[in-house]
């Protein structure tokens, strides 16, 4: 008579980037624990077998037929827009080069103003989405990603329910989850451009005012393809803040003459899928 053995297999994934919960689950910026019982007939599992199961589940989930079909049904998307970014670092921000921030932490904000865009059949024209974050003390952006002090995303309150859901989804691509949890707020997001000065207001919480600086040979300095570049940061123009303030997440920032960046971009889901796959490989190679 066959004897039945059961083993409880516990899988724990620590992920650094929240990308797509169907296509690339390896890269979530959350910790998820899933438990199930495996029925083993007439025998026991060796340590090697247990390790093999864990690796197979960690690396192979995304290729299951059911999940592949679900991924194929995800809406395609495309966004043309402008990036406004500022942080507490001195210009240019060293964090994009895997270096330590200029101060103990990097207190940063980035806001995307969508000129034209869609998520599936949902138009995103004229909407905006932003993020405020803070890295841990004395650690680089790269080594600490996923364990930042906080991660707050602000969604344009002009968006209807469908647009809000779309912007929430896109925020996981534009702003990979930097902390263990993420807060969402729906607020007015506005921008004013007067001459060289760009001013962004994010509800009652954040204010960013900055301008481009002059390069030695004329025109603003351009940073191209830094080590941590992503599709909206493939290249950007370098500037300096006039003022960066933030009052939320138990913070009270007041910075002047710090890092400011500006860029125009045109991205879509295919560009991000390629980028996110490359980032997952880089993280794996780093042993993180």
Task: Describe the residue ranges of each PLM region.
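Short, low-complexity intrinsically disordered segments enriched in A/P/G/S/L with frequent Arg
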Residues: 3-4
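N-terminal leader/targeting signatures
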Residues: 7-13, 24
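Short, Lys/Arg-enriched N-terminal segments with co-localized hydrophobic residues
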Residues: 19-40
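Bacterial N-terminal signal peptides that target proteins for export
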Residues: 39-53
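Bacterial N-terminal signal peptides
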Residues: 52-62
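Sec/Tat signal peptide C-region and signal peptidase I cleavage site
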Residues: 63-70
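Beta-strand-enriched cores of mature, soluble protein domains
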Residues: 73-288
């Amino acid at each position: 008579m066959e004897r039945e053995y059961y083993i409880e297999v516990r899988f724990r994934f620590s992920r650094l980037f929240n990308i797509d919960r169907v296509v690339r689950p390896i890269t979530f910026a959350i910790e998820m624990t899933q438990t199930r019982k495996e029925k083993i007939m007439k025998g026991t599992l060796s340590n090697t077998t247990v390790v093999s199961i864990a690796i197979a589940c960690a690396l192979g989930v995304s290729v299951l037929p059911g999940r592949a079909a679900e991924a194929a049904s995800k809406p395609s998307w495309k966004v043309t827009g402008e990036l406004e970014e500022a942080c507490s670092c001195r210009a240019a921000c060293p964090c994009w080069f895997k270096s330590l921030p200029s101060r103990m932490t990097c207190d940063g904000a980035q806001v995307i103003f969508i000129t034209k865009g869609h998520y599936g059949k949902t138009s995103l024209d004229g909407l905006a989405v932003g993020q405020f974050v803070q890295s841990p003390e004395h650690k680089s952006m790269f080594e600490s990603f996923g364990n930042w002090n906080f991660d707050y995303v602000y969604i344009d309150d002009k968006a209807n329910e469908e647009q809000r859901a779309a912007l929430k989804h896109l925020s996981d691509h534009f702003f990979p989850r930097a902390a263990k949890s993420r807060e969402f707020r729906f607020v007015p997001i506005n921008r004013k451009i007067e001459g060289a000065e760009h001013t962004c207001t994010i509800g009652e919480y954040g204010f960013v005012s900055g301008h481009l600086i002059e390069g030695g040979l004329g025109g603003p300095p351009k940073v191209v393809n830094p080590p941590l570049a992503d599709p909206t940061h493939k290249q950007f123009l370098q500037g300096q803040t006039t003022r960066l303030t933030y009052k939320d997440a138990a913070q009270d920032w007041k910075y002047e003459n710090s890092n400011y960046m500006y860029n125009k971009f045109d991205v879509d889901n295919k560009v991000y899928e390629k980028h996110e796959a490359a980032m997952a490989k880089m993280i794996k190679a780093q042993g993180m």
